């Protein structure tokens, strides 16, 4: 502003009247505005306090839930470790049982194979004996047929019958 505008009575200037209106406005409505403003700020502060209380409560609940989750995690890890150890032990027992079963099966099969071999050997020996006995009996028959005639058979039978009582006494 310029100096010539400020000269004269203060009520002749618009700045004076704006200041008066401003003061008058605050005198008339200041208490209502101040009351409304403070009540609004108080309600906002109460709301903030409630939100903070709720946040603290939620934080405590979250911490409790976190602690519970950690405890359950530790329990689950312990349970998993126990189950894993149990599974390892069970697997070792199963492997040992399978090994024992396989060993027993091998022994049974070996015994069966040995039994089959022994049976085959016995059958072969019996067959050879039978064949040898058959060959010997045929050879004896041929020799007897060549050496002795039809009359010699009767003499042999008579001789065998006469020796029979001695053989029975000796036995």
Curated annotation (Swiss-Prot):
Superkingdom = Bacteria
Q: How does it sit in the membrane?
A: Single-pass membrane protein
Q: Give the gene that encodes this protein.
A: atpF2
The terms under GO molecular function for this entry are: proton-transporting ATP synthase activity, rotational mechanism; proton-transporting ATPase activity, rotational mechanism
Provenance organism:
Granulibacter bethesdensis (strain ATCC BAA-1260 / CGDNIH1)
Q: Please give the Pfam families that the UniProt record associates with this protein.
A: ATP-synt_B
Q: What does this protein do?
A: F(1)F(0) ATP synthase produces ATP from ADP in the presence of a proton or sodium gradient. F-type ATPases consist of two structural domains, F(1) containing the extramembraneous catalytic core and F(0) containing the membrane proton channel, linked together by a central stalk and a peripheral stalk. During catalysis, ATP synthesis in the catalytic domain of F(1) is coupled via a rotary mechanism of the central stalk subunits to proton translocation.
UniProt GO cellular component terms:
plasma membrane; proton-transporting ATP synthase complex
**HAMAP family assigned:** ATP_synth_b_bprime
Instruction: Tell me the InterPro entries matching this sequence.
Output: ATP_synth_b/b'su_bac/chlpt, ATP_synthase_B_chain
Q: Where in the cell is it found?
A: Cell inner membrane
Name the family. Answer: Belongs to the ATPase B chain family.
Q: List all membrane-crossing ranges.
A: 9-29
This protein's assembly is summarised as: F-type ATPases have 2 components, F(1) - the catalytic core - and F(0) - the membrane proton channel. F(1) has five subunits: alpha(3), beta(3), gamma(1), delta(1), epsilon(1). F(0) has three main subunits: a(1), b(2) and c(10-14). The alpha and beta chains form an alternating ring which encloses part of the gamma chain. F(1) is attached to F(0) by a central stalk formed by the gamma and epsilon chains, while a peripheral stalk is formed by the delta and b chains.
Name of protein: ATP synthase subunit b 2
Give a yes or no for keyword Kinase in this entry: no
Q: Does the keyword Glycoprotein apply?
A: no
Annotated keywords: ATP synthesis, Cell inner membrane, Cell membrane, CF(0), Hydrogen ion transport, Ion transport, Membrane, Transmembrane, Transmembrane helix, Transport
């Amino acid at each position: 502003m310029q100096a010539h505008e400020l000269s004269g009575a203060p009520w002749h200037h618009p700045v004076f009247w704006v200041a008066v209106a401003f003061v008058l406005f605050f005198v008339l409505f200041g208490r209502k505005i101040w009351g409304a403003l403070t009540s609004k700020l108080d309600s906002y502060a109460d709301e903030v306090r409630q939100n903070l209380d709720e946040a603290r409560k939620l934080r405590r609940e979250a911490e409790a839930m976190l602690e519970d989750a950690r405890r359950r995690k530790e329990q689950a890890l312990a349970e998993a470790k126990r189950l894993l150890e149990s599974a390892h032990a069970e697997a070792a027992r199963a492997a040992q049982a399978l090994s024992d079963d396989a060993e027993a099966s091998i022994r049974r099969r070996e015994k069966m194979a040995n039994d089959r071999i022994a049976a085959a050997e016995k059958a072969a020996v019996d067959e050879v004996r039978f064949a040898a006995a058959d060959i010997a009996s045929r050879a004896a028959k041929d020799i007897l047929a060549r050496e002795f005639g039809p009359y010699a058979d009767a003499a042999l039978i008579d001789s065998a019958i006469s020796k029979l009582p001695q053989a029975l006494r000796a036995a």
